[in-house]
Amino acid sequence: SKEPVSVVLPDAEHPAFPGRTRRPGNARAGSQVTGSREVGQMPAPLSRKIGQKKQQLAQSEQQQTPKEKLSSTPGLLRSIYFSSPEDRPARLGPEYFDQPAVTLARAFLGQVLVRRLADGTELRGRIVETEAYLGPEDEAAHSRGGRQTPRNRGMFMKPGTLYVYLIYGMYFCLNVSSQGAGACVLLRALEPLEGLETMRQLRNSLRKSTVGRSLKDRELCNGPSKLCQALARSKSFDQRDLAQDEAVWLEHGPLESSSPAVVAAAAGIGHAGEWTQKPLRFYVQGSPWVSVVDRVAEQMYQPQQTACSDXALIVQK
């Protein structure tokens, strides 16, 4: 009879996580395989020891209360805000996005952005910072002067359309079109709720160096490009419908925020004249996940901001 042929299985790149590897079947990387089975068997003493350990764990789980089971689970395997998938709120429909940019930017605070990966994993983050762009009259907007190009087409599509663009040749930013031609809302920061370890892996895969300290939770999504990396967002999401897409959508936030919204000037805008100082950025006060904190704005608009209309805030210089 012929001798069995042993081969070494290479590691294949995982489609959902660039830089990570996916191993064929259940075989270990670099293990020898004959036909469809791994060579070698587990030593009997080790097998008995593992069996005893499994039995002990099973008995322990039977004695635990639901609360104890959740607290003893290593890592954040599911959102702390939902006890089951059935408890999750329905996605927001197209009518929700049909609002003026400023109104929509404020309404986004507290809502939950969801990203479903190719393997079914769902990542969730609560929106804590946004920025409104008002369209042709806005000198800081890509649509200033009514300019339409293939790049910014999403800004002129129906409300709820994603507008994704590249900056510095390597980072992406995620916007949502609103009511009004050329108007949109930039999503600037999220509070990670579910899938934190996956977010961390996605961020690490795109970092220049993964050697050194691990990213803290508050560093995962505290910036426009960071949240795109953490949720595996790329240019392929441009012009998708946030109300209909199967890989990305918005849900009602599970918790009402007790913190007021801070109204501040846009961040990171250089050459847009007076529009660099327009109070068109909104964030949840006290949130550690916000990208840029404006202490002056917090003192200026709290608590009297609730008595101001959005229009009054926009025209203020």
UniProtKB/Swiss-Prot annotation:
A molecular function (GO) term: DNA binding
InterPro entries per record: Formyl_transferase-like_C_sf (IPR011034), MPG (IPR003180), MPG_sf (IPR036995)
Pfam family membership, one: Pur_DNA_glyco
Gene Ontology CC terms: mitochondrial nucleoid; nucleus
Biased composition range(s): Low complexity: 53-64
SUPFAM superfamilies tied to this protein: FMT C-terminal domain-like
Location in or out of the cell: Cytoplasm; Mitochondrion matrix, Mitochondrion nucleoid; Nucleus
A GO BP annotation: base-excision repair
Main subcellular location of this protein, as a coarse class: cytoplasm
Keywords associated with the record: Cytoplasm, DNA damage, DNA repair, Hydrolase, Mitochondrion, Mitochondrion nucleoid, Nucleus, Phosphoprotein
Entry function: Hydrolysis of the deoxyribose N-glycosidic bond to excise 3-methyladenine, and 7-methylguanine from the damaged DNA polymer formed by alkylation lesions.
NCBIfam families given in the database record: 3mg
Name under which the protein is recorded: DNA-3-methyladenine glycosylase
Species of origin: Rattus norvegicus
